[in-house]
From Swiss-Prot:
Keyword field: Calcium, Cell adhesion, Cell membrane, Cell projection, Endoplasmic reticulum, Glycoprotein, Golgi apparatus, Membrane, Nucleus, Postsynaptic cell membrane, Repeat, Signal, Synapse, Transmembrane, Transmembrane helix
SMART domains, per database record: CA
Residue(s) at site: Cleavage: H824, M825, F853, A854
Membrane side Extracellular: residue ranges: 29-859
GO cellular component: cell surface; endoplasmic reticulum membrane; extracellular region; glutamatergic synapse; Golgi membrane; membrane; neuron projection; nucleus
Protein known as: Calsyntenin-1
Name of the gene this protein is made from: Clstn1
Transmembrane portions of the chain: 860-880
Consequence the record notes for mutating M901A: Almost completely abolishes KLC1-binding
Family: Belongs to the calsyntenin family.
């Protein structure tokens, strides 16, 4: 059955529903119930030099208060509830901001506020928060979302090109080998991303070269290289990053081809010149060990400096042995038995020496020579400790006894009191005890068996004797005797002893008594005396000191060389290198497993000579090396290296002595207790002459030459010798004296003899000046003394450098008694004439007298002084008149009157007597002699006045005699010529 359609809603019902709906919408708009919502994390990407950020997920804020999409046709869309009004970024210095694109959907974007640089910062992290528009027209009741984290990465742009780390590269390879890698070139890129910052490839741009480069920059050869074909290759290499961007600047690579490798030391010079006074000099500054790429486990290198031919094994100070002991701090009392020959020590004059002063003076004993030491030089008490020191060079000359030092009976008996001798390669010291009440065996002979006794090298031997023990030091190393023989003490006698060096003195009885050496007989009282047991070898520096033993420090000081090898390596440069040095600094041993570190240590080895004036000459150097390899079968051998250090000749100092050479003193001063000072104004200086190169280039100007410049230097002196010239000093009436206390304060010793006095000791020139100022000469019998002459010579380094001979003549002024002044005519001739001659000789010299009241001038002295004064006045007047006459002559020649000055000089006689004003005074024989000389000079003037007048300029430069002649020639009136 058909149903009836439902009736439509009534209009009233429709109105009711609309009102309900409208009422509900108004309520919803009035309430902001929900907060906006964001994703917890966002990831973004932005390209540098751009500002748009691509986010994942997109930036959208949701709000449940938002109207549904199907309700968009209703009035609720005009309200603010549910809309997103903005985003807020939290963080410091964040170069981004967030912008709302659509408020209703909550969509937004993030963008950069400035251009970003990936090289400065690759990524950024910050938080963001969304907020809605609130409720009502005024936007109150705003709600914010939670904070979401945003990570943004800055994408790189390939804006930088690769750049090589080095401007150029160098390498060297050995010919004939295929190398897996010769060297590596490396470039870097400043871009920040791995894609653009990494170098993906290298390329050799130079065509047709036997080399290739891989992606890591390693260059290798593609074929074996030939040194004869090419010595060096030059390659141009470029680089590309992974973005295919090429380096803006290519790099130059130089590969040198070396000939076939030979292991050994390279980069050294066979000759090294050493300038004295320059300190340490590196001898191998560029040396390195070539191992030819062989694997090396360790290397040992030994550097030796050969100095055995210099002095006594090396360069040492060449002062006397006594001075050296004092410099090393030894106590006083050392007696030198082999001194350099001098006036005071003359017993070594006949011995052959090395004939040179550059090094130590050594004495040669050939088996037939010996020297007897004068009595009093050595005072030795065997009961007290004493020391014997000697330098010796001895070879293997068989098994005969050879005596170095021997003290034996002078006459009657052959007893040896003490002696030091060589027997084969043994050194024996004999010491017989003095007579005593106890007659029992005591140690008498001490034996040492040493190679140093007969190896023909210089060695230093020191015997410290303190009965009953004897200690021997050889080159500073102590040695105990291997055998000691005992014997009875000597029988008491009154026989004097004789000390001999180089042999032994004993009475010849016709039988050799076991002495193998042929005797050299000498006639003497008490029987035939002779020398026996002669020494064959060289000796130097033989000294004996009684009363005290030598200290070990003194022994080491005496032996220490002044030259040697030195190695000063920085702490960070000797890692893994072991260094050993000999006590003499002549041998250095280096060992290490790192060849590079060993090379650095070898480059720091230096030669040093601390002497101010070293001995010039060659010092040979030798390097011997031992290499240990991991594979012993294929280990390389390093040949030895030989060179030399040439020590150049030092600038020789010129020692100059200056002062007053000639002076006179009153006889009373000679006879006084103080005497007179011989060198009151002595000055000692030393200079050297150097060549100074000109500033201009000599090749440009051949006239420019090197100039010599003299420079004053300071050094020590070791000897000053004052000797008397003429007769020897007579100890009964004259002497040379000096204050001993002042000498000791200066460290200088004085030894007196009939020939003078010798000052010894290593001291400064100023100290010697002061000491010589103190030297005084006394003579308490001056009645017959007119003058005395002395000579002074100073030296350095035991006579190596000598000063000039400084001579002093001192005259005695004899004063007349008052009676003699009143009656001078009665003066004895033996007083007048000698004194008169002495004062004539003193003209032009210093006649200063520090005590004027102690001398009363004689009549002759007054007359001479007046004559000399008048003579000087005449010279001055003559020079003036000569110049005036010369000017008038020139004027006459200008007017044409050249003949007006001609005259007849045959009868012209001019006589000037400078003594005529003193005719009434008492005259001496000396005045008459002077007048005769003046008259003879006048006669010569009469012969040629015109010639003298034309040579007036020469007369002005002449001596007093010439000036006097000129004065007399002009004592006339040139208008009338009448007298």
């Amino acid at each position: 059955m058909l149903r009836r359609p439902a009736p439509a809603l009534a209009p009233a019902v429709r109105l009711l529903l609309a009102g309900l709906l409208c009422g509900g919408g108004v309520w919803a708009a009035r309430v902001n119930k929900h907060k906006p919502w964001l994703e917890p994390t966002y990831h973004g990407i932005v390209t540098e030099n751009d500002n748009t950020v691509l986010l994942d997920p997109p930036l959208i804020a949701l709000d449940k208060d938002s109207p549904l999409r199907f309700a968009e046709s209703f009035e609720v869309t005009v309200t603010k509830e549910g809309e997103i009004c903005g985003f807020k970024i939290h963080g410091q210095n964040v170069p981004f901001d967030a912008v709302v694109v659509d408020k209703s959907t909550g969509e937004g974007i993030i963008r950069s506020k400035e251009k970003l640089d990936c090289e400065l910062q690759k990524d950024y992290t910050f938080t963001i928060q969304a907020y809605d528009c609130g409720k009502g027209p005024d936007g109150t009741g705003v709600k914010k979302s939670h904070k979401a984290t945003v990570h943004i990465q800055v994408n790189d742009v390939n804006e930088y090109a690769p750049v090589f780390k080095e401007k150029s590269y160098k390498a060297a390879v050995v010919e004939g080998k295929q190398h897996s890698s010769i060297l590596r070139v490396e470039a870097v890129d400043a871009d920040c991303s791995p894609q653009f910052s990494q170098i993906c490839s290298y390329e050799i741009l130079t065509p047709d070269v036997p080399f290739t480069v891989d992606k890591d920059g390693y260059i290798k050869n593609t074929e074996k290289l030939n040194y004869g074909k090419e010595h060096q290759y030059k390659l141009t290499v470029t680089a590309y990053d992974c973005g295919k961007k090429r380096a803006t600047e290519d790099v130059l690579v130089k590969i040198s081809v070396k000939p076939t490798c030979s292991p050994g030391w390279q980069g050294w010079s066979s000759r090294i010149e050493y300038e004295p006074g320059t300190g340490a000099l590196a001898v191998f500054p560029s040396i390195h060990l070539e191992t030819c790429d062989e694997p090396v486990a360790s290397v040992q290198a030994t550097v030796e400096l050969e100095t055995s031919h210099i002095g006594k094994g090396c360069d040492r100070d060449t002062y006397s042995e006594k001075s050296l002991h004092r410099l090393c701090g030894a106590a006083a009392g050392t007696s030198e038995l082999l001194p350099s020959p001098s006036s005071s020590f003359n017993w070594t004059v006949g011995l052959p020496t090395d004939n040179g002063h550059d090094s130590d003076q050594v004495f040669e004993f050939n088996g037939t020579q010996a020297v007897r030491i004068p009595d009093g030089v050595v005072t030795l008490d065997p009961k007290e400790p004493f020391t014997i020191s000697v330098w010796m060079r001895h070879g293997p000359f068989g098994r005969k006894k050879e005596t170095i030092l021997c003290s034996s009976d002078k006459t009657d008996m052959n007893r040896h009191h003490y002696s030091l001798y060589v027997h084969g390669c043994r050194l024996v010291f004999l010491l017989r005890q003095d007579p005593s009440e106890e007659k029992k065996y005591r140690p008498a002979e001490f034996h040492w068996k040493l190679n140093q006794v007969c190896d023909e090298d210089w060695h230093h031997f020191v015997l410290n004797v303190e009965v009953p023990s004897v200690t021997l030091y050889v080159d500073g190393i102590p040695h105990e005797p291997f055998s000691v023989t005992e014997d009875y003490p000597l029988h008491p006698t009154k026989i004097e002893t004789q000390l001999v060096v180089g042999a032994c003195w004993q009475e010849y009885s016709g039988v050799e008594s076991g002495n193998e050496t042929e005797p050299a007989t000498m006639a003497s009282a008490g029987g035939d005396l002779h020398m026996t047991q002669f020494f064959r070898g060289n000796l130097a520096g033989l000294t004996v000191r009684s009363g005290k033993l030598a200290d070990k420090k003194v022994i080491d000081c005496l032996y220490t060389c002044k030259e040697g090898l030195d190695l000063q390596v920085p702490e960070d440069a000797n890692r893994g290198v072991q260094i050993q040095a000999s006590s003499s600094q002549a041998v250095l041993t280096l060992e290490g497993d790192n060849v590079g570190e060993l090379d650095k240590a070898m480059q720091h080895i230096s030669y040093l000579n601390s002497r101010q004036f070293p001995t010039p000459g060659i010092r040979r150097l030798k390097i011997t090396s031992t290499v240990k390899c991991f594979n012993e079968a294929a280990c390389i051998e390093v040949p030895p290296v030989e060179g030399y250090v040439m020590v150049l000749q030092p600038e020789e100092p010129k020692i100059s002595l200056s002062g007053v050479h000639h002076f006179a003193r009153a006889a009373s001063e000679f006879e006084s207790a103080e005497g007179i000072s011989l060198f009151p104004e002595l000055r000692i200086i030393s200079t050297i002459t150097r060549e100074v190169e000109p500033e201009a280039d000599g090749s440009e100007d051949p006239t420019v030459q090197e100039s010599l410049v003299s420079e004053e230097i300071v050094h020590d002196l070791d000897t000053c010798e004052v000797t008397v010239e003429g007769d020897e000093l007579n100890a009964e009436q004259e002497s040379l004296e000096v204050d001993v206390t002042r000498l000791q304060q200066k460290g200088i010793e004085a030894s007196h003899s009939d020939l003078g006095v010798v000052f010894t000791g290593v001291e400064t020139m100023a100290s010697y000046e002061e000491v010589l100022h103190l030297l005084r000469y006394r003579n308490w019998h001056t009645r017959s003394l007119l003058d005395r002459k002395f000579k002074l010579i100073c030296s350095e380094l035991n006579g190596r450098y000598l000063s000039n001979e400084f001579k002093v003549e001192v005259n005695v002024i004899h004063t007349a008694n008052p009676v003699e002044h009143a009656n001078h005519m009665a003066a004895q001739p033996q007083f007048v004439h000698p004194e008169h001659r002495s004062f004539v000789d003193l003209s032009g010299h210093n006649l200063a007298n520090p005590h004027p009241f102690a001398v009363v001038p004689s009549t002759a002295t007054v007359v001479i002084v007046v004559c000399v004064s008048f003579l000087v006045f005449m010279i001055i007047l003559g020079v003036f008149r000569i110049r005036a006459a010369h000017q008038r002559t020139m004027r006459d020649q200008d007017t044409g009157k050249e003949n007006e000055m001609d005259w007849d000089d045959s009868a012209l006689t001019i006589t000037v007597n400078p003594m005529e004003t003193y005719e009434d005074q008492h005259s001496s024989e000396e005045e008459e002699e002077e007048e005769e000389e003046e008259e003879s000079e006048d006669g010569e003037e009469e012969e040629d006045i015109t010639s003298a007048e034309s040579e007036s300029s020469e007369e002005e430069e002449g001596g007093p005699g010439d000036g006097q002649n000129a004065t007399r020639q002009l004592e006339w009136d040139d208008s009338t010529l009448s007298y």
